[in-house]
Amino acid sequence: MHQVLYYQSPIGVLKIKEENNCIVGVHLLTESEEISKTEVESKCSPLLIKACTQLTEYFAGERTSFSLPIKFTTGTPFQHSVWNALRNIPYGETRSYEDIAVAVGNPKAVRAIGQANHNNPVLLLVPCHRVINKNGSLGGFGCGVEIKKQLLQLEGVL
């Protein structure tokens, strides 16, 4: 069984999904997506409430790491290794796609790192926004480069 909570953040509405006491998804809704009335429950789980609290603290600049259980229910073993490596990038720091490729033991997989970032199911908690190009340019971001820039500014990187 899963529960969903919609959270209004400074970057837009985040859909947070929990399954079996683990966060399995944090997704930024696009303008064309709507809040699913069938998924909204009147009572939220303690974990979803904790997730909202921690996200509020993060966006207020009061939290630099998340202490929420995460489980990857999608993706390949390679993508899981990338997402776990991303969780080790500290707040206020960035790594290049090449750095992550080296960290997962596949230095030539730079493009695959970018694809894994694009498929990251747990936005913010798995900080794919902290991965930039080797030359220091921001690179891509599934939610748009402006949001990536906003998150890196929040963290004091830019």
Regions found by a protein language model. Name each.
Residues N135-L158:
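…primarily DNA-binding HTH/wHTH and HhH modules…
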Residues K108-N120:
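Regulatory, non-catalytic segments
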Residues M1-K108, L154, L158:
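Basic nucleic-acid-binding alpha-helical/helix-turn surface characteristic of O6-alkylguanine DNA
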